[in-house]
């Protein structure tokens, strides 16, 4: 019988950070939980980052994942927005790393290709395939659905990723 691995996917954002937890065993996938963390826009940046960090650490303690998958940041024309996203992403990398989880990063196109078969699909296609692959999945936002897609992507790439990590060590 295959070992069950619990994976958390994290879709970082300063306003909304999606998270999704799945169990993966052999070729079996099971939805565990998903949700969205929000930070209070009335607070300063440091306080908002603390809110996200506390929320993520609480989720990590509650669901006890063994591996984490985080979306790789993209750069857009708005430098300020890109910087804020990068800071939220740092929290998404830090929280599981401090919990001693291996953290893997995936570009949005790789996630889409893993979940829907093409690298340039839209949000609706991703949400539909998340529901197909995880029929019991419930998510409160597109950020949570994207986080589940990250966890699914990692479940398909984890053997190669862990092998690559051992080679690089």
From Swiss-Prot:
Query: Per UniProt, where does Mg(2+) 1 bind?
Result: 11, 143
Amino-acid positions noted as binding Mg(2+) 2 in the UniProt annotation, renumbered to this chain: 71
Is Nucleotide-binding among the key words of this record?
no
What enzyme class is recorded for this protein?
hydrolase
Q: Which SUPFAM superfamilies match?
A: Ribonuclease H-like (SSF53098)
UniProt keyword annotations, A-Z: Cytoplasm, DNA damage, DNA recombination, DNA repair, DNA-binding, Endonuclease, Hydrolase, Magnesium, Metal-binding, Nuclease
Can you name a GO cellular component term? cytoplasm
Q: What is its EC number?
A: 3.1.21.10
Localization recorded for this chain is: Cytoplasm
What is the cofactor note?
Binds 2 Mg(2+) ion per subunit.
Question: What function is annotated for this protein?
Answer: The RuvA-RuvB-RuvC complex processes Holliday junction (HJ) DNA during genetic recombination and DNA repair. Endonuclease that resolves HJ intermediates. Cleaves cruciform DNA by making single-stranded nicks across the HJ at symmetrical positions within the homologous arms, yielding a 5'-phosphate and a 3'-hydroxyl group; requires a central core of homology in the junction. The consensus cleavage sequence is 5'-(A/T)TT(C/G)-3'. Cleavage occurs on the 3'-side of the TT dinucleotide at the point of strand exchange.
UniProt-recorded name of the protein: Crossover junction endodeoxyribonuclease RuvC
Native organism is Bartonella henselae (strain ATCC 49882 / DSM 28221 / CCUG 30454 / Houston 1) (Rochalimaea henselae)
């Amino acid at each position: 019988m295959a070992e069950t691995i619990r994976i958390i996917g994290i879709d970082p954002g300063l306003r909304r950070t999606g998270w999704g937890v799945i169990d993966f065993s052999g070729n079996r996938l099971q939805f565990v939980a998903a949700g969205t963390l929000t930070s209070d826009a009335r607070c300063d940046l440091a306080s908002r980052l603390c809110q996200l960090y506390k929320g993520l650490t609480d989720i990590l303690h509650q669901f006890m994942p063994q591996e984490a998958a985080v979306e790789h940041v993209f750069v857009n024309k708005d430098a300020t927005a890109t910087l804020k996203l990068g800071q939220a992403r740092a929290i998404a990398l830090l929280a599981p790393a401090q919990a001693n989880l291996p953290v893997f990063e995936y570009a949005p196109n790789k996630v889409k290709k893993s979940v829907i078969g093409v690298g340039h699909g839209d949000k609706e296609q991703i949400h539909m395939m998340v529901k197909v692959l995880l029929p019991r999945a419930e998510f409160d936002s597109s950020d949570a659905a994207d986080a589940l897609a990250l966890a699914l992507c990692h479940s398909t790439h984890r053997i190669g990723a862990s092998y690559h990590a051992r080679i690089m060590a």
